[in-house]
Amino acid sequence: MNDREPNQKESKESVNDAVPRARKVDDQQLRVSKIRDGTVIDHLTAGEALNVLAILGIDGSSGEGVSVGMNVISDRLGRKDIVKVEDRELSQSEVDVLAVIAPEATINIIRDYAVVDKKRIERPTAVTGLLFCPNRNCITNANEPINTRFIVLDEGLQCDYCGSIVRESEVPTYLDVA
């Protein structure tokens, strides 16, 4: 009879028959498509891609296309995240922020589908003007024309003026990126 409702098994089979099957993704195939021009931020710690986008203020509202691959298999890291931002190259201050929050990252500049510049970010010894000091009494928080300066430590950053510590997990809270 045609008036009866199909059972779940029949329903799945008919849906599967109607939808073209996707090609199997093998180890050599890209999971995220190539971009013509822009920046690829590779080798991010797994689970950090969305934090990196938020910290850098990249949300696609400026018109750039943004692709994110999360928890992708990596020979070097085991698992990693990757971010592709079309039609935009990171400024030096954005690269400096990345160096603090994602020191293992690699930045690739893409032009006409080719990598024209590839650099591995290295953690700096100090950063200037990127963070607010958490100490309200620090000279950098007064109405003085002084840029903050933090010494980069293994566990975070230390204010060069008052000695306050910003732990690595707290860095996003104190970022001062325009």
Curated annotation (Swiss-Prot):
One of its GO terms (biological process) is pyrimidine nucleotide biosynthetic process. Residues 1-15 have a biased composition (Basic and acidic residues). Zn(2+) binds at C133, C138, C159, C162. One of its GO terms (molecular function) is metal ion binding. GO terms for cellular component: aspartate carbamoyltransferase complex. Its cofactor is Zn(2+). Residues 1-23 are annotated as: Disordered. Binds 1 zinc ion per subunit. InterPro entries: Asp_carbamoyltransf_reg_N (IPR020545), Asp_carbamoylTrfase_reg (IPR002801), Asp_carbamoyltrfase_reg_C (IPR020542), Asp_carbatrfase_reg_C_sf (IPR036792), Asp_carbatrfase_reg_N_sf (IPR036793). Keywords: Metal-binding, Pyrimidine biosynthesis, Zinc. Pfam families: PyrI, PyrI_C. Transmembrane segments: none annotated. The keyword Metal-binding applies. Contains catalytic and regulatory chains. Belongs to the PyrI family. Involved in allosteric regulation of aspartate carbamoyltransferase. This is Aspartate carbamoyltransferase regulatory chain. It comes from Haloquadratum walsbyi (strain DSM 16790 / HBSQ001).
